[in-house]
Amino acid sequence: MNKCILIGNSSDILNKGLGSYIDNFENVVRFNRFKIKNFEKDLGTKCTHWVLNYKLTTDSRNYLVKNLQKIKSQTTDLKQAIILTTAEDKGEINKIKKQIDIDIIYKRFKPPFDSKPTTGFLAIKYLLDIFPHLTLVGFDFGKSNHYWGNHNISDIPGKHEWGKEKSYID
């Protein structure tokens, strides 16, 4: 069995029918505001690790706490939330740990570029320290919008140094 796959949020993952392929991995990692419902054929349903950026998790959106039960009802095998950031935690992670029923990992990285790195980039860095081989799907380094909707401004990837991230990954 393949060990680990990281599912990116770019729309280039659609219409490829990768759902079964993805679900056959031992570790399936998704991040931030990923969606499963209506995308099962292309994205599968398995999620063993959910990577979130620190801000999404700790600001007023409280995304992890507010969405954990929904995510657990739509996916299989969720065992861990991984919060990745270049920001310093000021006690927020411990507060969140008391509110949820899965394991949380918090990892802070030194900023690799002048601008904020994407959560996907930080996830790749984190996972490569754990798995010697990492399969990536759904990454196009800012060429498309998120797969789950192209209609709202919040669906457009933020300002990141896509070229630098792509060069680092290549």
Regions found by a protein language model. Give the residues of each.
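Metal-ion/cofactor- or nucleotide/acyl-coenzyme-handling active-site neighborhoods
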Residues: 1-170
